């Protein structure tokens, strides 16, 4: 594995949030000027390689991998299909965690679920059910997420306060946080659907 592959792998897993030169330097141990050179090389490689669907962009202080604009029509078909289809169990689980714990970071969601949530969270942002509501004042300035008005419309809620109150869970409970969020969330959504 070469140095640029390490940087590329970090860009990939950073997803839509992107990653800063400082973070790339911290994770890889390479100096910032070396990181900038690698990013420049990657950007040029993506530009000249007609067989890749990706390109590297910089927005603000972060770098991210995105799809090339000429692929927009095929991606619109994909996301249009997904927007009409139901939500996966993972998407419902993430939505319920965001709804009850907002504002919340992706890392906090991952910790509650015990698995990586980046791709599903990104799809929820694209579907306008979740949005970035701010950034934490800590290293890396991670984004915080919250629900949208579209989320309320999608589930027939007038206000986020209409979600059911979570029961207190004792230490001896078999339910973990993510199970509890999802159970309560689904119970509320089933109730709403029966009333329609």
Swiss-Prot record:
- Cell division recorded as keyword: yes
Q: Where found in the cell?
A: Cytoplasm
| Keywords, alphabetical | Cell cycle, Cell division, Chromosome partition, Cytoplasm
Q: Which GO terms describe its cellular component?
A: cytoplasm
Kindly list the biological process annotations in GO that this record carries: cell division; chromosome separation; DNA replication
Principal place of residence: cytoplasm
Tell me if Transmembrane helix is a UniProt keyword of this record.
Answer: no
Give TM segment ranges: none
**Which Cys pairs are S-S linked?**
none
Q: HAMAP family this protein is in? A: ScpB (MF_01804)
Subunit comment: Homodimer. Homodimerization may be required to stabilize the binding of ScpA to the Smc head domains. Component of a cohesin-like complex composed of ScpA, ScpB and the Smc homodimer, in which ScpA and ScpB bind to the head domain of Smc. The presence of the three proteins is required for the association of the complex with DNA.
Query: So what family is this one in?
Result: Belongs to the ScpB family.
> What function is annotated for this protein?
Participates in chromosomal partition during cell division. May act via the formation of a condensin-like complex containing Smc and ScpA that pull DNA away from mid-cell into both cell halves.
The name this protein carries in UniProt is Segregation and condensation protein B
User: What organism is recorded for this protein?
Assistant: Pediococcus pentosaceus (strain ATCC 25745 / CCUG 21536 / LMG 10740 / 183-1w)
């Amino acid at each position: 594995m070469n140095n640029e592959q390490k940087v590329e792998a970090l860009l990939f897993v950073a997803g839509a949030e992107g990653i800063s030169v400082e973070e790339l330097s911290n994770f890889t141990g390479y100096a910032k000027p070396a990181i900038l050179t690698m990013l420049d090389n990657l950007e040029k490689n993506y530009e000249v390689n007609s067989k890749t669907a990706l390109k590297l962009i910089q927005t603000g202080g972060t770098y991210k991998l995105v799809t090339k604009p000429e692929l927009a029509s095929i991606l619109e078909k994909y996301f249009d299909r997904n927007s009409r289809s139901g939500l996966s169990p993972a998407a419902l689980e993430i939505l319920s965690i965001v709804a009850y714990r907002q504002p919340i970071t992706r890392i906090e969601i991952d910790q509650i679920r015990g698995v990586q949530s980046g791709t599903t969270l990104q799809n929820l942002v694209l579907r306008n059910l979740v949005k970035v509501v701010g950034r934490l004042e800590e290293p890396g300035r991670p984004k915080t997420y919250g629900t949208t008005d579209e989320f309320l419309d999608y589930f027939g809620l007038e206000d986020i306060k209409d979600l059911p109150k979570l029961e207190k869970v004792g230490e001896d409970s078999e339910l973990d946080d993510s199970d509890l969020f999802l159970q309560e969330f689904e119970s509320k959504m089933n109730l709403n659907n029966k009333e329609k």
